C-alpha cells in the first residue's frame, strides 16, 4: 500500500474492518504464497464497490478484511463450510501453502496452484453477516 494510490487508501479507510473468527478450535485457516483473497461479483473487481471483499488470514483462527462502507469494525464467526471454501480459494491461487496440521495440508493439496486470478463470490457462501457487509 505504500506505493498505492491515495484512492486505494481512501477506499480502504472508508470501509472499516471486518474480523472473521473460527469458533471451532479444530478448524483453521491456511496461509498461501498468495495469501490475500479477493471475492468479487462477475461484473467488477473495484474495491469501492461494497460487494467486493478482500481478506487475509493473520492467525490460524482469525482473518481480517475490508468491512462495510461507512461503518466501524465488525466481528463475525465463520461456518466450517466457509472455512473450507476460503482455504480452497487461497490454495487455488497459491503455489505453496502452510497450515496447522498435516491432514489439513494433505486435504487441500489438490487445490494448490490450480488458478491465479480473481475469484467470484461463492454461490454457496452461507454467512448471513456476509450479505449485511455487502449492503
Question: Can you annotate each of these PLM segments?
Answer:
Residues 1-135:
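Alpha-helical structural context detector biased toward long hydrophobic helices
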Amino acid at each position: 500500500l505504500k506505493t498505492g494510490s491515495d484512492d486505494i487508501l481512501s477506499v480502504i479507510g472508508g470501509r472499516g474492518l471486518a474480523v472473521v473468527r473460527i469458533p471451532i478450535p479444530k478448524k483453521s485457516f491456511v496461509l498461501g504464497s498468495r495469501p490475500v483473497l479477493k471475492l468479487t461479483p462477475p461484473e467488477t473487481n473495484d474495491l469501492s464497490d461494497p460487494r467486493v471483499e478482500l481478506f487475509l488470514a493473520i492467525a490460524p483462527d482469525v482473518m481480517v478484511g475490508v468491512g462495510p462502507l461507512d461503518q466501524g469494525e465488525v466481528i463475525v464467526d465463520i461456518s466450517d463450510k466457509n472455512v473450507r471454501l476460503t482455504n480452497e480459494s487461497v490454495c487455488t491461487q497459491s503455489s505453496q501453502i502452510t497450515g496447522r496440521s498435516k491432514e489439513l495440508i494433505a486435504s487441500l493439496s489438490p487445490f494448490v496452484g490450480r488458478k491465479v486470478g480473481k475469484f467470484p463470490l461463492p454461490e454457496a457462501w452461507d454467512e448471513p453477516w456476509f450479505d449485511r457487509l455487502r449492503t
